[in-house]
Amino acid sequence: MSRGGSFGGGQSSLGYLFGSDNEIPKTPAPPVAPKPAPPYGVDSTEEDHEADQKPKISNNNYQRVQGQNSGNFVTDRPTTKVKSVPGGGSSLGYLFGDK
């Protein structure tokens, strides 16, 4: 058997990767007809609903003297504002015991 010769098994089936001299012409798919509209009408679109809906207003977004992100705005927790300087007193006394 010479180098580069076929050793049986027929021709390679990798023609789809590297191109083939024996390409089979493909028939184009038939065009898809558009779907006809139903005789009873169509549903309304989102544009119609936008005008009907009232704007949503948050009932807990009101003016505060300290600013909007203070107090129990969303989480019903006290403010997280830093109250001591770096290296100063710790607010973790309840964990480690006040000294």
Swiss-Prot record:
One BP annotation, GO: cortical microtubule organization
Annotated region (Disordered), positions in chain: 1-99
Positions of modified residues (Phosphoserine): S58
Polar residues bias spans: 56-73
Record InterPro entries: SPR1/2/3/4/5
UniProt feature, compositional bias: Gly residues: 1-12
Free-text tissue specificity from the UniProt record: Expressed exclusively in stems and flowers.
Function: Acts redundantly with SPR1 in maintaining the cortical microtubules organization essential for anisotropic cell growth.
Family, as annotated: Belongs to the SPIRAL1 family.
Name used for this protein in its record: Protein SPIRAL1-like 5
Originating organism: Arabidopsis thaliana (Mouse-ear cress)
Classification lineage: Eukaryota, Viridiplantae, Streptophyta, Embryophyta, Tracheophyta
